[in-house]
Amino acid sequence: MMENTRIRVGAEAFSVGDEYTWLSQCDEDGAVVTFTGKVRNHNLGASVSALTLEHYPGMTEKALTEIIADARSRWSLQRVSVIHRVGPLFPGDEIVFVGVTSAHRSMAFEAAEFIMDYLKTRAPFWKREATVEGERWVESRDSDHIAAKRW
């Protein structure tokens, strides 16, 4: 299934259009679901001027591979693409892309949401925000852990 899986972690920007084109090439699938996360210009009541993402190389990709394998064991999926940027990012920049294909929309929607929920709670990424008050590390939210528990 690795030929039907794309995992990329890096500083480079990605093209949502290119990912959609790759995902949609499976003629047997009736559903393509994608999610793109962006840097907000605010968080926890403060203006955000930049966000720096760090990760543990090798371990991060391993965690993403395991999350995708878990999704594949729950839903019948064809292609899966997960991209996560690291390094300095700014409001409006795209951070994360999750795309999945399946025969039916319900499986594709659920699998994409599952992957995103688990990515937020199980993949080793660390965020540092720059605000007017200075820099601060962003802790994981309780809502992310609650969302992941439903699976």
Swiss-Prot record:
GO terms for molecular function, please?
molybdopterin synthase activity
- What InterPro entries does this protein map onto? MoaE_sf, Mopterin_biosynth_MoaE
Q: Name one GO biological process term.
A: Mo-molybdopterin cofactor biosynthetic process
Q: Spell out the SUPFAM superfamilies in the cross-references.
A: Molybdopterin synthase subunit MoaE (SSF54690)
Q: Does the keyword Lipoprotein belong to this entry? A: no
Taxonomic superkingdom: Bacteria
Enzyme class label: transferase
A Pfam family per the record: MoaE
Record EC number: 2.8.1.12
UniProt binding sites for substrate? 38-40, 104-105, 120, 127-129
| Reactions it catalyzes | 2 [molybdopterin-synthase sulfur-carrier protein]-C-terminal-Gly-aminoethanethioate + cyclic pyranopterin phosphate + H2O = molybdopterin + 2 [molybdopterin-synthase sulfur-carrier protein]-C-terminal Gly-Gly + 2 H(+)
The annotated pathway is: Cofactor biosynthesis; molybdopterin biosynthesis
The record's function comment reads:
Converts molybdopterin precursor Z into molybdopterin. This requires the incorporation of two sulfur atoms into precursor Z to generate a dithiolene group. The sulfur is provided by MoaD.
What does the sequence similarity comment in the record state about its family? Belongs to the MoaE family.
Relate the assembly described in the record: Heterotetramer of 2 MoaD subunits and 2 MoaE subunits. Also stable as homodimer. The enzyme changes between these two forms during catalysis.
Protein name, entry field: Molybdopterin synthase catalytic subunit
Taxonomic lineage of the native organism? Bacteria, Pseudomonadati, Pseudomonadota, Gammaproteobacteria, Enterobacterales
